[in-house]
């Protein structure tokens, strides 16, 4: 299930980032350039799961229940990937959970235009340290919020799983919980 999910996630990412790949098709296969889209991974995993369930004459809903906790673990790890790649953050904040990212990072990777269109640069913070000016943005760590929310859903499902009343119930809890987050 994992390999088709990764393939689906990559296809999804490439389709929605086609301008970056249309002139250099071999880059599609370079997983270090670009990323993965979880929606594509989930779609591909469900397609493979439905085929597998039909061939094996198994309950697709039971299999989806089984897959739910793994999906949540994958999402939690993916959010930490967003942290290490300094992406998928929220808008400006000066709150206690503010994540500070040096502007040099975005300049280095040619991503300053993303900050301009989002309005985050309107709140650029600049400090002088040892005579050197350091500029950074302060943003909501949305990866952290989503990761912690997913962890809470995972714990709820883990504790409830032995009490479920019907196949597909854990999937329903996941969908409702994730949607509420």
Locations of regions flagged by a protein language model:
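A feature for loop-to-transmembrane-helix boundaries and adjacent hydrophobic helices
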Residues: 1-181
């Amino acid at each position: 299930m994992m390999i088709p999910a990764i393939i689906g996630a990559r296809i999804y990412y490439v389709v929605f980032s086609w301008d970056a790949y249309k002139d250099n098709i071999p880059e599609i296969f370079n997983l270090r350039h670009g990323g993965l889209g979880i929606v594509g991974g989930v779609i591909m995993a469900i397609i493979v799961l439905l085929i597998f369930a039909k061939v094996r004459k198994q309950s697709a809903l039971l299999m989806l229940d089984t897959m739910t906790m793994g999906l949540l673990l994958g999402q939690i790890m993916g959010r930490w990937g967003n942290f290490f790649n300094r992406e998928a953050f929220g808008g400006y904040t000066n709150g206690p959970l503010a994540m500070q990212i040096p502007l040099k990072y975005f300049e280095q990777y040619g991503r300053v235009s993303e900050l301009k269109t989002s309005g985050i640069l309107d709140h650029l913070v600049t400090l002088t340290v040892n005579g050197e000016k350091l500029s950074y943005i302060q943003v909501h760590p949305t990866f952290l919020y989503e990761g912690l929310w997913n962890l809470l859903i995972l714990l709820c499902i883990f504790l409830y799983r032995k009490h479920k009343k019907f196949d597909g119930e854990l999937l329903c809890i996941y969908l409702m919980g994730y949607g509420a987050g």
